[in-house]
């Protein structure tokens, strides 16, 4: 099978390109500029006005390109996110349709359902996006759904929670570096669990989602990587070889303090529950994640401190 990948130079995209090539697929990486590392695993085309021509011969496309953070350009955050996560998604879908690509997998975000939930999130859970990024991802889903309703091609929407793995960007490595300094942290009482997904498992699911037997539908994806902030800090301290020095502060008080310094959303994402129910992915596609959560997190944290690869002694998280 020939698989095209947008966002191929991003964190997930690189892993997807490599995994697809290693499984014997022909891979077309759509990039803004040529990349020497990707050249080992894929043919490359620079995205331009000839996108339909570049996609000729592809059986499926995984659309990962988008905008997660705004660099100030004088435009509103909402407009920048909409251009990247809605309008560009439609451009790719139109090019794929013109090129005869049969299947498109759109990587959205669990954030379309909000940033907290007392019940596990499923595909039919209410929409409640609360950031410009999440709003734009939902707009992308809705626009692509309308577009594909008029075409014979199939659309698969994938909603992952926060993605982690060796070398991952974002809050996880920042928190790990803070823990490694051995400073006292006020997170011992933060026991609400949130779902994550290991990048290797997400990539495995995406390769399943673009197979010919998959009908167009939506999937919440996870792998059992459910951790509280207190559990993460304990794991990180073990991986860094330092003593965990947490003390309890009520989560509500942490959120109040965060609001005072304009970090309300960040603290919400650390202290409130947000679990996903990915049973539909298991039952509909017969999919099982190849990497176990405790092993995946241990691998991720060990990569932060390669000189301390002593393993993580305590197994935290589901079986």
Briefly describe each language-model feature range.
Residues 73, 177-197, 201, 205-209, ...:
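A conserved pocket-lining segment of Rossmann-fold NAD(P)-dependent short-chain dehydrogenase/reductase
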Residues 90-132:
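Conserved Rossmann-fold NAD(P)-dependent oxidoreductase catalytic core, especially the SDR/UDP-sugar
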Residues 138, 151-153, 164-174, 209-219, ...:
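Glycine/proline-rich active-site loop of Rossmann-fold NAD(P)-dependent oxidoreductases
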Residues 130-156:
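Active-site Tyr-X1-5-Lys
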Residues 36, 46-91, 95-98:
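NAD(P)H-binding glycine-rich loop region in Rossmannoid oxidoreductase-like domains
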Residues 3-23:
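N-terminal Rossmann NAD(P)H-binding glycine-rich loop of SDR-like oxidoreductase domains
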Residues 6, 165, 187-192, 219-227, ...:
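Glycine-rich Rossmann NAD(P)(H)-binding loop
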Residues 208-266, 294, 298-301, 308-319:
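Mid/C-terminal beta-alpha module of Rossmann-like enzyme folds, strongest
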